[in-house]
């Protein structure tokens, strides 16, 4: 009861002060707050680079994908894209924050602003470049056919009626649906590309269509998938980084790429991870 009375008296005093002229300072404070809040809202809506820099971080959407983004044997989160993104963020004066996403819903997460960009071996396509702000190409790639050792393979026609896997929403899936032979296979989508390797290794799939960059790093002698091999190279493609449509960050990242190419950083990383830079 004492608290209620005290609260009532405090409220009455506040109203009395407002009536005696306190409203001017309150109004000024509110106006100042609104004035200071308006630019922040405008920045977030119209200027992604300033928004990212004001937050002090770039939220990067990725999936586990060696050699681009993965955790090594010592428990360190690393990879070509991980190191490159960190170097670019340093040039932009922000910290990278890596957030694991579902690759099949990557565009939705980007549009919802739960991430600032998709930076994870993203294949550049006309559709993606039309609907998102993409950087220039920075790494070369291709889609390859992976099968178990001992498999007879001469062309994609050998996979008609067979079980073929690819990551949902990936360039591999597009390759399957658009290829005259592969489109006649029994296609099963998987959450990530590494799941595709597991299916082929286990014999539950006859072949996987996935990125050359990943296959080169993860299959063959000395790897966990020593019984798998690449037998065909299909679509040649290039990787880029995607931001929201109209974002000015893509251009800033392109400028950082130019600087990192000029000082040899990108080539050093490409050599480290066995990749080929885009021209």
PLM regions: where:
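Ligand-binding clefts/hinges and TM-proximal coupling segments of bilobed small-molecule sensing domains
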Residues: 44, 54, 171-191, 226-230, ...
């Amino acid at each position: 009861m004492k608290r209620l009375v005290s609260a009532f008296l405090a409220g009455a005093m506040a109203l009395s002060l407002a009536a005696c002229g306190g409203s001017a300072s309150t109004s000024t404070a509110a106006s100042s707050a609104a004035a200071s809040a308006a630019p922040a809202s405008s920045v977030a809506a119209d200027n992604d680079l300033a928004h990212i820099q004001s937050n002090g971080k770039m939220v990067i959407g990725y999936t586990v994908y060696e050699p681009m983004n993965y955790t090594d044997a010592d428990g360190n989160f690393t990879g070509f894209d991980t190191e490159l993104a960190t170097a670019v963020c340093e040039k932009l004066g922000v910290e990278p924050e890596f957030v694991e996403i579902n690759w099949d819903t990557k565009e939705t997460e980007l549009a919802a602003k739960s991430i600032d960009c998709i930076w994870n071996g993203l294949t550049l396509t006309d559709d993606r470049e039309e609907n998102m702000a993409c950087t220039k190409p920075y790494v070369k790639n291709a889609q390859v056919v992976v099968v178990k050792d001992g498999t007879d393979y001469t062309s994609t026609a050998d996979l008609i009626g067979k079980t073929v896997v690819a990551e949902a929403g990936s360039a591999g899936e597009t390759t399957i649906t658009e290829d005259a032979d592969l489109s006649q296979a029994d296609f099963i989508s998987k959450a990530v590309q590494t799941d595709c390797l597991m299916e082929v290794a286990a014999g539950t799939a006859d072949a996987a269509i996935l990125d050359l960059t990943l296959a080169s790093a993860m299959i063959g002698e000395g790897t966990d998938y020593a019984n798998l091999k690449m037998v065909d190279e299909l679509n040649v493609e290039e990787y880029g980084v995607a931001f929201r449509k109209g974002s000015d960050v893509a251009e800033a990242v392109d400028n950082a790429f130019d600087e990192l190419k000029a000082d040899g950083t990108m080539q050093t990383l490409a050599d480290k991870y066995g990749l080929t830079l885009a021209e």
